[in-house]
Amino acid sequence: MSIGDGYVGMNINPRMAGRQAGFDHFGIQVEDVEAVRERVAKKYPKIEIIQRPSNRPFAALGIHDPAGQYFDLSQAGLKNRAEVYEAGTWEQKRRFSHFAMRVIEPERLAEFYAGVFELPLTNSPAGDGAFALTDGRMTMHILPWKISDFLGTGIERPALDHLGFEVDDLAAFKKDVEELRIVNPLMMPKPTGVGAEGEARLNTFKRTGLGEHYLADLDGVMIAIKEAKH
């Protein structure tokens, strides 16, 4: 299943045998896939770019960064693209705003994404040693991974950390989530901040400062919500 906000698309895939669940990977659309391929081959010759199966409506190629994080690479007009990825653009009041990953070498990876994809690089408001790259609408935050951030809770490996959304009215959003929970209790977000370990994990999330409201989806993927500036 694919959903989108008129600019960013997201695929929600069933978990198959041997595959991880959760926030698995992201994708980047470029104007010229071959130009990206040339930049990667020149500076990162050990990084491989492979063809994805033809039934993927969201990706033509698979690639990874120097830390091994896999992501999709696509270009408008490629024959395998379909669904929300070819539905055109539109504006809406609730939209994707960012995503974040925690990594051992944030500066190294920030330089990779900035150089290969020609994205402006800035310091992230998430804290010391964090970086942000944006195309003007969607932002990637690269956060330092430190084992001490997980003191008092379960330790998570360096990986994608959370999704971020921007809404026009945070109070209205919270009300809608509550109404959805009443209509269908199975749609209730997974509880966060429950017990000592849950509280420690939630506090780690809040320290990023990338949201005003924090929750998790039904599968446990962490989500940061922020109200749009008017």
State where each predicted segment sits.
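Vicinal oxygen chelate
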Residues: 2, 15-92, 95-104, 124, 132, ...
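Generic secondary-structure microfeatures
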Residues: 117, 146, 167-169
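Intrinsically disordered, low-complexity, compositionally biased regions/tails
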Residues: 8-10, 168, 202, 215
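Conserved short beta-strand elements that form part of the metal-binding/catalytic scaffold
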Residues: 1-21, 63, 69-78, 120-157, ...
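Surface-exposed interaction/gating patches
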Residues: 91-138
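Generic domain-boundary/flexible-linker signal
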Residues: 37, 79-82, 110, 174
